[in-house]
Amino acid sequence: MESKVIVIHHGSHSLKIGLASESVPKTIPNYIARKKKEKISTPTITTTETPTIVSPVESTIINNKSNENNDDIMKIDVENTVTPSEAVGTTTEDVKSTLPMATTITTDEQVKPTSSTSSTSTTEEVEIKPTESMDIDKPITDSKTNITSNIKIEQPPPPINIQTQTKIHIPKKLLEEVEQSVKETTKLLPPVDYIKVRQKPTLYNENNSTTFEIIKKKKKKTSSLSSLTNVSTTPPPYVPQPLNYNEIDYCIGDDAIAVSRDKDKWFAYQPITMSTFNTGIYHSVQSMFDDITQMWKYAIQRYLNIPSSDLSSYGCVYVVTDNIDRKSLKQITTLLLKELQFTSVLFFQESICSSFGVSMATQSCVIDLGHQKISIACVDEGYLLPNTRLTLGYGGEQLTKLLEYLLTGMDKSDSDTLTRQMVAKQIHKYYFPFKSSIYELVDFSPFYLNVFDNIKIENLDYYYNDFQKQRVGTFKVKDIKHDKHMNIYHFNADEVYQVVGMSLFYPNILSQFGGSSVNYLIKSRSLANTSESNLYVEDQKHYYNHYLSSYDHEDPFDDHSHILSFAQNNTSRDNKDGSNNNNIINNNIINNIINNNNNNNNNSSSSSNNNNNNNNSGSNSNINSYNNNNNNNNNNNNNNNNNNNNSFNNVTIVTSTLNSNSTVPSTLNSNSTVPSISNSNSTVPSTSTSTTSSPTKKLKIESSSNCEDNYIDIPLDIAILKSVSQLERSDINKKKYLSNILLVGGGALAPGIQDVLRVCIFKQLEQQYQAQQLQFQQQLQQQQQQQQQLQQQLQNSTNSATTTPTPSSTTIMPLENYIGFANSSIRSDVDCRHAGWRGGAILGCLESTREIWITRSEWQDGKNSSALNKLPF
């Protein structure tokens, strides 16, 4: 069955697809390109003589004949078109033969020319509206699918360099903090383990930075006699034929990136962003599903050489994200089993597949450094712990945009131009040759992002302590004016790579270039603020009814039993007490829908008193203040269960290890004040999607196309500690996960990232250790004072000998460097970028997974409820 299984891993950067028997998948960039509609000019004829009247019957006959031959191919205005039936000795049938095939001929019902006329040609825009879908099994020469009419970006917006970069504003202080963090991190890095070669690099300027070469045609290989005699039994790997972009109007992957440079004829877009459906660019959801299905069919046929008619004999392993939405999973299952006609489908999560892909079955913390997001989760022997799932709304694409922004020059649209130019010179001191010109505009389009992404991959590293290394970058770009010329650019760069690499721990900088929005997170989570009680009193029933109306009875993956029981409890309480109906709904609907907690049965007076005690200690800007509040929260753990709503907006998290003043709001609850490892009693609720659908997702003031409520923007080092701290296990087990960190994805290939990440995590642990030492000293002083007061009271009252309590002699063990990475034990033939796909291929071939395959017959015969029991998560 190995050769009959196709593994699909559709991530934010690329579509990885291939047979399970293959060792490496076909990597296809996640782009679709379509050719824009062409404006066709049609000839119209104007008359100069007096017309004669024609009967309406003749005009109707001519119109019916023309409409029968042309069904909805092109649209032409009927009232503004005049067709000469007898002009210059020609008939209507002759005129029809001379006009384009797709033109519909119409006539005026009251006018008919009788004599010679002078013809002039005028242009008229015609809209082509295809009706049939593309047959993917045939050679892809034209696209007949009317997907472009359902996409909002038919006409791309103005260039981003003009429209978007004017809004990008990176504060000078924030860039200085990043540079200072680079310097302090450099002091803690281990020495470089290779020989430093000191060379004087060439300084490039406007005169010597650009050269060109002539592109030579590839010669066809001729078969020799020796090759004919030595015939191998294994067939050569299938290589798709190159496409002629002038003959097609649909392509994906690298072809879509190549044609996206010609913005006048093509436009490129992504159907999936951040590993979720990109519904923001489509007018209808069905058109988006058709687009994704067509992309999968095209990829299977072109890159795997498997026609879509043969997919009925193949099974599919689909690798989903860790926090997959249940309704999205239902749609993916329908597309794979009904549209693509696979026999069966098997789902596994990314973190589990990544651990199997690198042959690691022990306890590990899997970190996927992706293109548009970073996923963090703890895996224990093939089981993903749901409380530890975290997703950061930034990734390698934001680093690429930041690099392009710094290399091409800072934005000069601000009034303080001199200050911005000085900041640009401090970061990038050298000349960069590839910039916008009158011939082309360098922006954030797919083609130019791919150019700067290659620059980032070749030059970005985290060896900050190698001061003698001078980076000289070289890249090639095809000349836009001469097709046979390839321009070669050379440039110098040093500090700019350090700032870009260290910005991975500063989400405030990366949020300027897309990804998850912090402001949106504040708006979507502001429902938890009880100060807006008037909003809930008026609209709380509307929100609850809206959630019930969005309930999908056909969804086998969603369990709404807790909502139904909640509704029954509210109805019984309303019947008992009708006077306090509004208060009951306010206290229960908010606590159950926002926090998804059924244990809020205490009085409202006790919760308000606890809120007043914790409002002053809820907002802090560094790790030390979090640890100071942790002791108070643990002492009053029973009273703090009802304070989630009032103290929600007071929680903040530091943006970096060295930035104690600037804070980033996050989506943490009030109980999750300390992402601490050493405190086993402090539990942090997970912000990721649980196995049951949470009502919080359905109750939003503003809708989001990309489900941004699943993403948080906190630094990477703090997110790792937060994920491990959410383990409901002892401190010893938590240390095992920290000592076995697995980095996968494209970002894991950056040289030196393990050492920098180890230093940043160690800083956070050291701050927590210092805070714990301070707490221990304060507790010890309080115990000594209480002992002295007790002794004085005993001496004043009686002189009898009594035993006095002694302070506890427990001490905090010193912090040890127990942070380790599992990447050093991975085999050299394993690519971290394909770890998820490789794990899916391994799991799809196991005999033990046959029982959890979802078959097509089970999905079509109304047995959808059985699919819930077959999910491995």
Swiss-Prot record:
InterPro entries linked: Actin (IPR004000), ATPase_NBD (IPR043129)
Q: Which of UniProt's keywords are assigned here?
A: ATP-binding, Chromatin regulator, Coiled coil, Cytoplasm, Cytoskeleton, DNA damage, DNA recombination, DNA repair, Nucleotide-binding, Nucleus, Transcription, Transcription regulation
Q: Which gene encodes it?
A: arpG
Query: What's a Pfam family this protein contains?
Result: Actin
Q: Name one GO biological process term.
A: double-strand break repair
Which segments show compositional bias classed as Polar residues?
651-668
Matching entries from PANTHER family are given as: ACTIN (PTHR11937)
Its cellular-component GO annotations read: cytoplasm; cytoskeleton; Ino80 complex
Tell me the segments the record calls region Disordered: 108-129, 596-701
- What is stated as this protein's family in its record? Belongs to the actin family. ARP8 subfamily.
Molecular function terms, GO-annotated: ATP binding
What compartments host this protein? Nucleus; Cytoplasm, Cytoskeleton
What protein name applies here?
Answer: Actin-related protein 8
Q: Which SUPFAM superfamilies match?
A: Actin-like ATPase domain
Explain the purpose of this protein: Plays an important role in the functional organization of mitotic chromosomes. Exhibits low basal ATPase activity, and unable to polymerize.
The UniProt record gives the binding positions of ATP as D368, L369, G370, H371
Quaternary structure note: Component of the chromatin remodeling INO80 complex. Exists as monomers and dimers, but the dimer is most probably the biologically relevant form required for stable interactions with histones that exploits the twofold symmetry of the nucleosome core.
Compositional bias (Low complexity): 114-123, 596-650, 669-696
Residues folding into a coiled coil are: 762-804
